[in-house]
Amino acid sequence: MRIRKNWLWVAVAVAVIAGGIVTAVLLRKSAPPDAVRLLPESDAVFYVNLAPIRLFTDLGKNLPKERDPQYEEFVRQTGFEFERDLDRAAFAIHYGVASTGKQAETRYSEVLQGRFDSTRVGNYLRKLATRVEPYQGYDIYIIPVEDRTLRVALLGVGIAAASNTDSADIIHGMIDRYRRAALPFVGPSLVSQYYRRVPLGSIVWTIARPPAAGGAEDHGELLVPGGWSGLLPPDGVVIASARPLNEVRLRADVITQSEAGAQKFKQQADVYLALFKSLEFSMDTGGPDQDVKAAFDSLEVHQEKQEVVLTAKVPYAFFKKVLSEPPVEFGPAAPKSGDQQAPPASSGAKAPNPKQR
């Protein structure tokens, strides 16, 4: 009888421990990435996981032979190359407010995770800094960059935080959250409210409130690439993501304040989409690019009550070209051969080729 009771208590203890582990795993799974949880309050959050991107592309494999001298010196002194050694990055975007005689300035706070030598990086930052401020056992490097102040802190092995906001409170808060081991549900309120809607497996995503027209510097490409940002309702929320499956699935949910607002945005997006599909897409090598064409042909827009959803399926080959070749060129679709008009006989010159640069 005593043996049975002992086994019963063992079984209960195992069940409790297993339940705790499962709960912790589920909480961790539904929580945003560690780097995001360190970020301060902001108007937009952008996250990218570069590790899987390197598997699908040549990023970091064919490093450029010629680079900016200042960046080359950074690499020489630190041994860190962003293309090769940066694994994950999270950005908080602060739009700023315009004041009398002063334009609104966008500021950024970021957390970078990768492989770097803390001693070498620390020595490099110390050379650039005008002073080093201690805070809770961490060194904050104060670095002047143009007319702003950049604060950088090395938080631990392979992780750094930086911010160019006016107040030091931002970087202090990032350090404090790191010291608390980045609890699962801390971080920007935008992320707490909307991260659950980011598709599982997304390696690039953003959650943002679009800026008011003329309220801050242009930074819309972090929200929805390709020029769509100018259409976004300023009182809405955008959740955009990219995740790799058979191809890269792109999705952007635009949440508006009303069905009428969603309908208006969809109508604008439909016009914009029709324009995109009328363009001819080519690489510098000349001729239509089928991967680019397939990506834009897959673009779809549909409305769900107060929301508008934009989706696209992009071939992996497209991203390989983007990261290894010259930029994609956009231009009006070339007229069919039967519709082309011959140049006047008296001109004495050949008709220009619209694909030539």
What residue ranges belong to the model's regions?
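N-terminal Sec-pathway targeting helices
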Residues: M1-V16
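Ser/Thr/Pro/Gly-rich low-complexity linker/stalk segments immediately outside membranes or between
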Residues: V25-D43
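C-terminal functional regions that serve as terminal interaction/effector modules
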Residues: L27-R28, L50-P52, V254-R357
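N-terminal, charge-rich interaction modules
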Residues: A35-L39, F46-L50, L55-T57
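Single conserved position on a long alpha-helix in the C-terminal lobe of the eukaryotic protein kinase
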Residues: F46, F82-V186, A252-I255, H302, ...
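An internal, short helix-loop-strand segment that often contains or flanks glycine-aspartate motifs
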Residues: I53-A89, V132-N246, A262, L275-S282, ...
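Short, conserved charged micro-motifs
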Residues: L55-T57, D117-N123, E259-K266
